[in-house]
Each structure stands twice: as structure tokens, then as C-alpha cells.
């Protein structure tokens, strides 16, 4: 049946030809909810039980990386190309198994004063002080919680890892204690540090974990890098 114009609509005596338009079903519309492209996955329970622990392990490992470094404040930049401190240089030499402490003191000479950084090798070995330059004092220095850091390369990683720890025992020092007390660690020549208060022994080559004594927190660790024995040291 052909509709040439509106006048043709007046002759509707035979509507049989319209059945084609009435009876034809509408073209289905695609919906991602009612007609998904991919069928629902049907994972075996055994596979799910295997994948869940792996996912949890990955998530927990990410958390461990984030918690590897302390959120406490530390800031120290030392240019050993200028200072030529041999004690620090020994600690910034890979595979040397030398850890040193650094602290800051104010010295007085007559009516004048100056600041110096004192580096001491573990085990009460060599020590050498370096006078802070004007650049050092202008950019500021924060040697951890209470004026003390431990610096050195670990022996048990390849490539070797350069560590910077706080000198305070993480299991004895409390920032909320009244009065606040200092619990400095003693660095040994064999790559360990001990606390005279709690008797714990920490392994400096493995991230500062407790090696002997009661279980507890590992050493407070800061981000650190060095460009070489007589290069630039950065702790933050």
C-alpha cells in the first residue's frame, strides 16, 4: 500500500496492508546491564582461595614499603667534597661495614661561637669534627629526634643500601613522656647498635630490626643518599 499524500489516508477500507507495520517487533536495544558483552566469570572456589592470599600479600607489601621510612623530621645535607671528613667517607663507602654517628655541637672561642658536626666511627673508633659552613647553617639542620643520626652501608644487600637511622632507641624513647628522656644507642664496630636501657640489639645492615632481646620496633629510619665517599650526603 502506498501513501502518496495526505488525501490517500481517507481511503482506509483495506487495512490489511498495515499489518506489516503493526506486527513487526521492535529492534532490540543493547544495554550493558541486560545484554552484557562478556558472560559473568565463573571462577572455581579453589582458584579464588588461591588468589586471595596473593592479593593480600601484594597489598601488605605496599604498606611495608610506605612504612619503611619514618614520618619524623630529619634534614641534613653535608658536602664532603668541601669538608673532606675521612670518618664520614668510610661510612659512605659501600661494603665497608662502617657505621658512624653524627651529632651537632656549638663551640665557643672567646666571645665567638661556631657550630660543628662530630662524626664518630662505631666501636669508639676514629672521630673527626667538621665546622659547619655558612651554607650549612642557612639551610638548617635537624639531626633526628634528639641530635643524633647513624649512617652507613648495609652488607647484606646487592646493590648495597645506604642507611640513615635515628640515634634514639625506638622502644624506649617517648615524645609524650614527662619528663622527656634521651635513650641514645651505642654503635658497635660489627654493624650492630645496642640500647643500655632495654638491652635490645639492632642489626644496622638489615633495616634496623631487633636482633637480640625482647621483640619490639625496628630502628627509626630516614631517607638517605650519597654520591660517594667524598661526595654529597642527603638525609631527609
Predicted regions mapped to residue ranges:
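C-terminal motif of bacterial Sec signal peptides marking the signal peptidase cleavage site
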Residues: 58-61
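Ala/Thr-enriched low-complexity intrinsically disordered regions
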Residues: 26-29, 34, 49-50, 55
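Residue-level signal for mature regions of secreted extracellular proteins and peptides
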Residues: 55, 162, 188-191
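Bacterial N-terminal signal peptides that target proteins for export
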Residues: 35-48
